[in-house]
Design a protein with these regions (language model features):
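PLP-dependent amino-acid enzyme catalytic core
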Residues: 1-204
């Protein structure tokens, strides 16, 4: 099978990104060993951010994982409401790798957050196929929200973030990374918060 984002073989090496980023922060003296870090991840299929969750479960000190979506914000709506609803218009955006309405890796998170309740997960996935919508029990959503936040960026906001990042930092970022930076910039920041914006593609 191909190494697309539903393949667990792709998620496994992505886990190392989080440990490597954390190790670099420690080596540079930005954080102390054991200090928690928040990661913001541009994603449509929930693969890369799920790798971050795996890293946390393996012991990496992760404060929050922020799911950044484009205008196809099915994940943002899900994390806010507990309702996954793919019955919506599909938008073609300038961050096409995130143009997804059925986020296949979310099933893996539901399995873990529900205490490995295979009957529940199977029921929810069947609803997604037959009805296009499902509602996750509040107890499971509470577990998910202990780690995950979410936000989204429109194409105009994405373009503006690319422009402002270049003007202010002289760093050229691709549209997918810009989605994450836009979302991260709008999350309230506490004193001593350390945050990492994942860049998942290159503009070059």
């Amino acid at each position: 099978s191909s190494a697309n984002s539903i393949n667990i073989g792709r998620l496994a090496p992505q886990v190392t990104y989080y440990f490597d980023a954390y190790a670099q922060l420690v080596a540079k003296g930005t954080i102390a060993q054991g200090q928690k870090v928040t990661f913001c991840v541009p994603t449509g299929n929930f693969g890369d951010v799920l790798a971050g969750y795996f890293a946390k479960e393996m012991g990496l000190p992760v404060e929050r994982l922020i799911v950044a979506s484009n205008s196809n914000k099915v994940l943002t709506d899900f994390l806010e409401t507990g309702i996954y609803d793919r019955r919506r218009a599909f938008e073609k955006t300038i961050s096409p790798s995130m143009d997804i309405l059925v986020s296949s890796n979310l099933e893996r998170l539901l399995y873990l957050a529900s205490g490995k309740d295979t009957e529940l997960v199977s029921y929810l996935m069947n609803l997604l196929v037959t009805k296009g919508i499902y509602t996750v029990p509040e107890q499971v959503m509470d577990t998910i929200r202990e780690t995950f936040d979410a936000g989204f960026a429109t194409d105009d906001q994405t373009r503006e973030t690319i422009r402002s990042t270049w003007e202010n930092c002289r760093v050229l970022i691709d549209p997918h990374t810009a989605v994450a930076k836009h979302v991260l910039d709008r999350v309230s920041r506490q004193a001593n918060d350390v945050r990492v914006c994942l860049s998942t593609a290159s503009p070059y």
